[in-house]
């Protein structure tokens, strides 16, 4: 189980990313349309003035149940270990243990 402070920090990053997403996209689009170097530098400074944690690359997918940051399945938003436990407890329909 991840520490609660790490989970809250990740939620804060998600809120910041949603808040500044449209502004960041519009600035990037504006930068691609502008040809003068001075204008590009001005736009670049505006991008840099945005909060660091509002960048989408700073986000990390975490398991919804445990908060584990690794081995997550994107479709389920759960870690592999939790999916395995749920399959063994017959909570996932159609999942059987493989053998060969």
Curated annotation (Swiss-Prot):
GO terms (BP aspect): translation
GO cellular component, one term: chloroplast
Localization per Swiss-Prot or TrEMBL: Plastid, Chloroplast
Any GO MF annotation of the entry: structural constituent of ribosome
Pfam families according to UniProt: Ribosomal_S14
InterPro entries in the record: Ribosomal_uS14, Ribosomal_uS14_bac/plastid, Ribosomal_uS14_CS
Main location: plastid
Keywords of this entry: Chloroplast, Plastid, Ribonucleoprotein, Ribosomal protein, RNA-binding, rRNA-binding
Keyword Lyase: no
Function: Binds 16S rRNA, required for the assembly of 30S particles.
Subunit structure: Part of the 30S ribosomal subunit.
HAMAP family referenced in this protein's UniProt entry, alphabetically: Ribosomal_uS14_1
PANTHER family the UniProt entry points to: 30S RIBOSOMAL PROTEIN S14 (PTHR19836), SMALL RIBOSOMAL SUBUNIT PROTEIN US14M (PTHR19836:SF19)
Family per record: Belongs to the universal ribosomal protein uS14 family.
Protein name as it appears in the record: Small ribosomal subunit protein uS14c
Origin species: Cryptomeria japonica
């Amino acid at each position: 189980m991840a520490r609660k402070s790490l989970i809250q920090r990740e939620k804060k990053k998600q809120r910041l990313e949603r808040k500044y997403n449209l502004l960041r996209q519009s600035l990037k689009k504006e930068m691609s349309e502008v040809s003068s170097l001075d204008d590009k530098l001005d736009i670049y400074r505006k991008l840099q003035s945005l909060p660091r944690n509002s960048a989408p690359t700073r986000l990390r997918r975490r398991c919804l149940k445990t908060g584990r940051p690794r081995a997550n399945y994107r479709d389920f938003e759960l870690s592999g270990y939790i999916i395995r436990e749920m399959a063994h407890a017959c909570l996932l329909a159609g999942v059987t243990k493989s053998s060969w």
